[in-house]
Amino acid sequence: MSFLTLGHRGVMGVEPENTLRSFVRAEASGMDAIELDLHLSKDGALAVMHDTDVDRTTDGTGPIAAKTLAELRELDAGQGERIPVFEEVLEAVSSPLQAEIKDVAAARALADVIRERELVGRVEVSSFHDEAVTEIARLVPGVRTVLIASRWGADVVDRAKAAGAATLALNIRRLTLEVVEQAHAESLKVIGWVVNTQDQLRLARALNLDGATTDFPEIRRTGRFTA
């Protein structure tokens, strides 16, 4: 079984997260796919950023939703990088992408781009929110979806199935073999996040995971040889 390695917000352990520089480095590092996060700007652009506000990762302050794309462009997202929009990432790298959305509104905006650019084969959509997963699947037939969870109950596999997700992305610190086996029995894949040490990588392989999200290029290099 192949083990997929996803670059977390590019390779945020060595580059400014969710920037074109980080995504290009992730692709050059041989990541199987690149994970990123999307929020809608005030004027409806799909801004690539993890947090709901810009404070942590830029030299600005305030919510993304309160700023236009032009205002977001003025901010430094690290080492002179600007906040990209999703369409720019599509042009900057050719890797498969896993795009995390935070709500139904973002699902609808992303659905438009996926349909217009025929990206069903390249873009996988993930969310912590069941309703966002359900909505993107409704809007884009055939799109691959991922339900993410940091903490979960005994119903997490049933939740993923109900939302139409093909994959569960679960916190490696809380993952058990029982959950992985339940998911696999229902033909769901399981990705562990975030795998940043050799011990965590060995755990991911011992749990028979289908892949892992990592901040560091070296996890991709060593992951190919870890049994």
Predicted regions and their residues:
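Phosphate-group recognition and catalysis centered on beta-loop-alpha active-site segments
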Residues: M1-A227
